[in-house]
Amino acid sequence: MFALVLAVVILPLWTTANKSYVTPTPATRSIGHMSALLREYSDRNMSLKLEAFYPTGFDEELIKSLHWGNDRKHVFLVIVKVNPTTHEGDVGLVIFPKYLLSPYHFKAEHRAPFPAGRFGFLSHPVTPDVSFFDSSFAPYLTTQHLVAFTTFPPNPLVWHLERAETAATAERPFGVSLLPARPTVPKNTILEHKAHFATWDALARHTFFSAEAIITNSTLRIHVPLFGSVWPIRYWATGSVLLTSDSGRVEVNIGVGFMSSLISLSSGPPIELIVVPHTVKLNAVTSDTTWFQLNPPGPDPGPSYRVYLLGRGLDMNFSKHATVDICAYPEESLDYRYHLSMAHTEALRMTTKADQHDINEESYYHIAARIATSIFALSEMGRTTEYFLLDEIVDVQYQLKFLNYILMRIGAGAHPNTISGTSDLIFADPSQLHDELSLLFGQVKPANVDYFISYDEARDQLKTAYALSRGQDHVNALSLARRVIMSIYKGLLVKQNLNATERQALFFASMILLNFREGLENSSRVLDGRTTLLLMTSMCTAAHATQAALNIQEGLAYLNPSKHMFTIPNVYSPCMGSLRTDLTEEIHVMNLLSAIPTRPGLNEVLHTQLDESEIFDAAFKTMMIFTTWTAKDLHILHTHVPEVFTCQDAAARNGEYVLILPAVQGHSYVITRNKPQRGLVYSLADVDVYNPISVVYLSRDTCVSEHGVIETVALPHPDNLKECLYCGSVFLRYLTTGAIMDIIIIDSKDTERQLAAMGNSTIPPFNPDMHGDDSKAVLLFPNGTVVTLLGFERRQAIRMSGQYLGASLGGAFLAVVGFGIIGWMLCGNSRLREYNKIPLT
């Protein structure tokens, strides 16, 4: 086992022209020989890796043997890796200019030496004259590059990468632009100096503000590339973004014409994507002994930028095709929407192959690079046009938060509690915007809290609240999110699909109510989450799942990233926020396949591009998106339904539950096809034995298993009662094949009346006439009672025994006869007959 010992010797080389060489030891010969080879390159920065044997200490004679004649320009850095037992190991020589010993400090100018919008006036960001005593030089003294490993591929011939077909050209220097086109500043408009919320109208209309801050507030910084493998870069910084988790990290530094994106993953080595103006050449730190200086790996410069990719030196698992793709990203477009659209597409496709413990390495690097490039593109677009829009800032902030969560949880396999992200962009102050937004929400009048004007307005407000939230949301934002979800739920009871605006509003409402970090002990927030999960699961009926899957397939089939932006909120479905994991079962996949012909355009695209097996595979993967999104998010489950994890129950963690339904606090219904280990267990009858359905009522305080009996009774009709008798109960429809079809929460008296209407119900799952004989239904009560739903009694009858009923009827009959005789005697035929006296004797 090697121990790492770093011995750094820094010596100026002095003239020893009249002094003889000392007889070298084996180590001296090796080092002296290599120093002689490098003598002629004394004006250049070089580094060298060599094998050698050497004594345990460095004495004066050894140091003197390293002289270079009259050369006074260089110093040696000797880095030693030694085995303490054999005293054998490696020596690395790193040679630096002597003038680095003279401290030199950059003087930051008051403003960047170039105006906005002028690429030709960009300051050269690369500097070779970094002070040896500057803190940015430390990585070069302790670098592992060329000592423990190499950051670059060993063969420089493969460093040159082909320019991708999607990269910018002279005819398209800024790449593609999406529709609608970016708004331009109207004439005579006075630009605000910074982004801020004055009124809610700022969201509905385009609000412009100046990009002058990029010029006046940028600061001069020095960037040390990955492992000190490239000489330092000086640039004017305009912002940074940091995305972290326990298994991944993305660090983005943005400057004027500059970007560095360091992307690392616990399961693989890091990479760094560097973007500089097209005239800039970076110098790699290499062991090369040729006359010319090598540039880091990357394609040829484009019309505006040059891209370099560092890392993955000895790792051949990262394909060259993927490398070329990533290098093309910064030049594909300066429209930030394009890169975010591609990130959403990759994220959606990643969920089709994800498991809760998987790491999707290639997707992780692609999405992270897209996120970084989108920030760079927005910064450069604002600088070149000299303005930004408020909705661009809100859009980017929400995208960073959402994509970071998906990137780390699904891409890196991170624990959700460890996921965090911060942004420090010079052209936007999230803290200030958050305070202004809170002020606007605080001005909402109580009379207006019970409704919202439109889904468009609600979407914009919730999007901004989600984007600028700092862990705790304003009470009125939470109230708006609840109302949006309930309104959409009521609408989906009678229809199967949502329009794009409704999907977007639902997405932001659910994100606000389900994803929060602070206030976990707040019972009202947990209750919000349980209610949201129950409503989302209720909206995810079998019919809606089919339509939602068709929406996703259409979104991907018609995807044209060079024209229109694609985002996950545009195709969001309640199924993505539900706790159903059964939608990949055969019946649901087949329902999707049978529904494809109802959308002729999609049907034509699929059958033109795919064969039958590929179409089936695509349908299966589409349904998998629903099961991966929330149902396997252990953070959400632990936070909102902790009772499924008590008693050391690993069923939820292992994905054994096909459905989870939060009931009253501390209790939940779960459906499983395995033998339950605890809870009140109801086994549904007349179900395929190979696909059984066990409904289990779990309590956080109960660790034993008990079998329950499903009651089969006609339930009282709710029209006879003013109160909602069945509110809080869940209607469950299933097939005798074992397939779960619909789960609907009875939320109000109106929904209860629809349930009791049976064959006259306008809610399709409630109407038995719309389903076959193999369709069955049960009602799950909040207290753990399960009843087979046969029908409802119109009026409540008085229960009496048979003997009592017979005696009552007999007595009534005799009374009627008696009263009839008396009446007949008193009143019968008095007008037709005369009364005769009884004769006397």
From Swiss-Prot:
Biological process according to GO: fusion of virus membrane with host plasma membrane; symbiont entry into host cell
Glycosylation sites: N18, N45, N217, N317, N499, N522, N760, N783
Residues of the signal peptide: 1-17
Membrane topology: Single-pass type I membrane protein
Intravirion side, ranges: 824-841
Residue stretches spanning the membrane: 803-823
UniProt-listed Gene3D superfamilies: 1.20.58.1340, 3.30.500.50, Herpesvirus glycoprotein H, C-terminal domain
Role this protein plays: The heterodimer glycoprotein H-glycoprotein L is required for the fusion of viral and plasma membranes leading to virus entry into the host cell. Following initial binding to host receptor, membrane fusion is mediated by the fusion machinery composed of gB and the heterodimer gH/gL. May also be involved in the fusion between the virion envelope and the outer nuclear membrane during virion morphogenesis.
Name by which UniProt lists this protein: Envelope glycoprotein H
Organism per entry: Varicella-zoster virus (strain Dumas) (HHV-3)
Lineage of origin: Viruses, Duplodnaviria, Heunggongvirae, Peploviricota, Herviviricetes
Gene name linked to the record: gH
